[in-house]
Regions:
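Short N-terminal signal/transit or membrane-insertion segments
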Residues: 2-17, 123-139
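Intrinsic disorder/low-complexity detector
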Residues: 2-106, 148-149, 154-228, 272-315
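A short linear-motif detector with a strong N-terminal bias
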Residues: 50-56, 112-113, 133-138, 171-176, ...
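Short, well-ordered alpha-helical segments
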Residues: 75, 80, 89-137, 215-262
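Short, well-structured alpha-helical patches and their helix-loop capping segments
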Residues: 109, 113, 144-150
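Short, conserved loop-to-beta-strand elements that form functional interface hotspots
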Residues: 132-144, 254-277, 281, 289-290, ...
């Protein structure tokens, strides 16, 4: 019941109790990793109707008709996650060497939030009775007004396939576009799942780097900041290692459609009347794990002959 309804005297305690019970039920479902009941009911109503929703372009939709793929509905998964307390490295003095450490609290927060969002996306797809979700997109956010919280939002289009699902009977998620997905199927491969990984590293610069990045020495000739370079490599390799481990767990033979996104934040630290600039490096890696499915299908190209001005004949 809304605030104006209360002012007008509409509704009652029974309605308030029902709303409170519904909220508590949804909170319990979310805490268990599921989706709110209203979202589940919306999906079931969409499936029961005759119309579908999708993020497909006109060309992509036309391709579904040619490939006997039926779009079902758009599905979504999200997770807003509070990051736990994270201890930052602290150098012992101006003359200390460089140090590099993974911020495990932040790394784990990103990976867990994304896993929860993908799980909810897959649950919506299951309620829709779909076999796969294509064109899965990720939106990773950190809000200025919630500095210790992150949000992961994933969207995709649930589709029904002529061959059904795989051995797991669960919808397969892929960030491939529909045309890429169709081409992959024709080549004798199938996606076995989305692979996603994040790593966050903290880099304390060495004495040499501090000299080159503070005070008058900023005007020195071009030089590589090798400890910062090493930190970026370490963060990338850590994220790639996790992604590769996920692919192996899915029984994949490779990863396609991979995207690598990275952010670098500067953190100023004052110590012993000196100021240094530390780096926080974040890598997000996303891709689709694939495996062979059998013999490839020929692409069967069409031949078009131009017989005159503006005339086209299809054999």
């Amino acid at each position: 019941m809304g605030f104006l309804d209360r002012l007008k005297g509409l509704g009652g305690d029974d309605e308030d109790d029902a709303e409170q019970q519904a909220r508590e039920r949804d909170i319990a479902r979310i805490e268990s990793g599921s989706i709110p009941l209203a979202a589940e009911q919306r999906i079931r109503e969409l499936v029961a109707g005759t119309a579908f929703t999708s993020g497909l372009s006109v060309a992509d939709f036309a391709l579904t008709r040619l490939e006997q793929i039926r779009p079902v509905c758009q599905v979504m998964g999200t997770s807003v996650y509070k990051v736990g307390w994270q201890n930052y490295p602290w150098s012992s003095g101006w003359g200390s060497d460089a140090s590099l450490i993974e911020l495990t609290a932040l790394t784990n927060a990103w990976n867990d939030a994304r896993a929860r969002a993908l799980g909810r996306l897959a649950e919506e797809a299951s309620h829709a009775g779909s076999h796969a979700v294509v064109d899965v997109t990720f939106d990773n956010r950190r809000h200025e007004f919630l500095s210790d919280e992150i949000e992961v939002l994933v969207n995709g289009t649930a589709v029904h396939l002529p061959e059904g699902t795989g051995a797991s009977n669960a919808p397969v998620l892929t960030d491939l576009s529909l045309p890429d997905y169709v081409l992959l199927r024709r080549a004798g491969y199938v996606p076995v799942g989305v692979v996603a990984s994040t790593s966050v590293f903290y880099i304390v610069p060495s004495r040499q780097t501090r000299r080159m990045t503070t005070g008058w020495q900023r005007t020195q000739p071009n030089q590589e900041l090798t400890d910062f370079t090493q930190g970026v490599y370490e963060a990338r390799e850590s994220a790639l290692g996790r992604a590769s481990a996920q692919a192996r767990a899915l029984g994949a033979g490779g990863l396609v459609g991979m995207s690598v996104e990275h952010h670098v934040a500067v953190r100023e630290v004052e110590q012993n009347n000196q100021t240094r600039e530390d780096l926080i490096v974040t890598f997000h890696i996303i891709g689709t794990a694939i495996a062979p499915s059998g013999e490839h299908r020929p692409l069967d190209p069409q031949t078009i002959l131009r017989l005159g001005l503006g005339a086209t004949k299809r054999p």
